[in-house]
């Protein structure tokens, strides 16, 4: 139940971030969320300063949402172009995706998908955060400091693995993880205006798909998104 509510929470934030203001009735119809549930969610988001009420029926992005995810009109073009492609690719491959950005100090999530069979992970657990920060020119020492800060339960073994991955990222500019259970994670960076972004796909490896083919497909998708938004 908690995961379902969290999913609806993100659906509302995504819709308002991309489309701007909307009425509660419009949201309830488009997102297929019961109006009473939606009203409670929106009330919580207003208290958190993620949304603001324009009147009794209409809501809009609040400064908290704009700062949290850089989801103002400034970046709506990026989201409109990226999100449909990410959702389509994720559904086709039956894998989760994370789309995140870096404001020079903090990593923030812009969009994510969560399939029931793939347990959701954070931008740090997925390996996307160090990929983005490395592409932005952040030092290994600062990446390691933020890794410890954002994953307080990490062991020394986790730290050693992270350090080795940082070295790999410096050379490859992206990160591909794979396990014997065919669990894959592919994180790739790209730039949008002055902001460094990144996309990660992770979960059970697609059937009849090699690692090389999947890596290429992910790279081509990110390239198409980067090319589309560069024409803004």
Language-model-derived ranges and their functions:
Residues 63-150:
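Amphipathic alpha-helical effector-binding/dimerization core
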Residues 1-72, 227, 231:
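N-terminal helix-turn-helix
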Residues 17, 137, 141-145, 219-231:
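Short amphipathic alpha-helical signal-transduction/dimerization elements
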Residues 155-229:
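Extended hydrophobic
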Residues 3-6, 62, 75, 79, ...:
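Short, structured helix-loop boundary elements
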Residues 56, 97, 128, 184-186:
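Short loop/turn microsegments at loop-to-beta-strand junctions
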Residues 56, 104-105, 193:
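Short strand-connecting beta-turns/loops that link adjacent beta-strands
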């Amino acid at each position: 139940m908690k995961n379902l509510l969290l999913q609806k929470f993100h659906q509302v934030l995504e819709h308002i971030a991309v489309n701007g203001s909307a009425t509660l009735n419009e949201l309830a119809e488009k997102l297929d969320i019961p109006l009473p549930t939606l009203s409670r969610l929106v009330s919580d988001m207003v208290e958190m300063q993620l949304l603001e009420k324009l009147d009794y029926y209409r809501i809009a992005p609040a400064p908290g949402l704009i700062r949290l995810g850089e989801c103002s009109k400034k970046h709506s073009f990026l989201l409109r172009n990226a999100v449909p492609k990410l959702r389509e690719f994720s559904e086709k491959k039956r894998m989760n995706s994370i789309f995140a950005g870096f404001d020079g100090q903090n990593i923030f999530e812009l969009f994510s998908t969560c399939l029931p069979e793939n347990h959701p992970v954070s931008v740090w657990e997925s390996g996307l955060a160090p990929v983005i920060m490395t592409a932005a020119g952040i030092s290994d020492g600062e990446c390691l400091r933020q890794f410890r800060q954002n994953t307080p339960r990490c062991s020394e073994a986790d730290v050693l693995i992270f350090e080795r991955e940082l070295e790999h990222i410096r050379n490859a500019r992206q990160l591909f993880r794979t396990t014997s259970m065919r669990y894959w994670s592919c994180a790739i960076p790209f730039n949008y205006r002055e902001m460094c972004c990144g996309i990660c796909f992770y979960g059970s490896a697609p059937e009849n798909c090699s690692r090389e083919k999947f890596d290429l497909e992910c790279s081509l998708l990110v390239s198409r998104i980067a090319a589309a938004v560069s024409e803004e």
